[in-house]
Amino acid sequence: MIRLLIIDNHDSFVFNIVQLLREHPRVTYDLIREDELCGDEMTRYDALLLSPGPGIPEEYPRMMRLIAEGVGHYPILGICLGHQAIAQHLGATLHQLPHPLHGHPAPLVDIDHSDPIVGGITEGSIVGRYHSWVVSRADLPACLIPTAYSEGAESEQHELMAFRHRQYPIFGLQFHPESMITSSGKAYIEGFVSEVEKELRAQSLSLTTITSQI
């Protein structure tokens, strides 16, 4: 059973995420508000999910600390603000859209079908966008692999909608899988759960190998 910590970044959408996980047979979870984090939470959990939220990542210093501590140590999925926070911590920049998007349906394009989170999604599947900032694709750090884009809201340039870390089980989704607008929303969460399970199996195998050599 996966022990998942969900960070509530003061956004009502977090309860839709909880609804997706509430009856999941392989996940137990706790929900903690970002401003109530005390610093030792991840000693009790296997993976971290960062919720959407208003504002920009630097307004959430405790979430940013968890990301800094987590890279290379536990799986992370960031949604919307969480996606932006992971990218910014790893060296990406954000740029502001000309007009905020709220409940904007958009098709996913250029999907990386080898990706464990978005790879099983059909090209052109609709996702719900609720954001006024986006991760800049121009200077995306080399450690992040783009895995899906969306048609630009007000330009012909496609905007980054998903990424994964090149080395670690760290993933970002700019859109909201928990939105009713998003088709196959559960599939994105299930993809992350499967990746966490894969990571836990690898850790267990590594520990068994080390123990047998002692």
Enumerate the predicted regions with their spans.
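N-terminal beta1-alpha1 cap of cysteine-dependent amidohydrolase-like domains
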Residues: 1-72, 79-81, 183-184, 190-214
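Generic structural signal for residues in well-ordered beta-strands
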Residues: 28-31, 94, 146
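Short loop/edge segments at beta-strand edges and connector loops
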Residues: 33-34, 96, 129
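Cysteine-nucleophile active-site neighborhood
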Residues: 45-120, 124-126, 189
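Short histidine/acidic/glycine/proline-rich micro-motifs that form metal-
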Residues: 54-56, 134, 178-180
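Histidine-centered divalent metal-coordination motifs
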Residues: 80, 131, 176
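Catalytic beta-strand/loop cores that center a nucleophilic Ser/Cys/Thr
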Residues: 114-167
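A glycine-centered loop/beta-turn motif at secondary-structure junctions
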Residues: 155-200
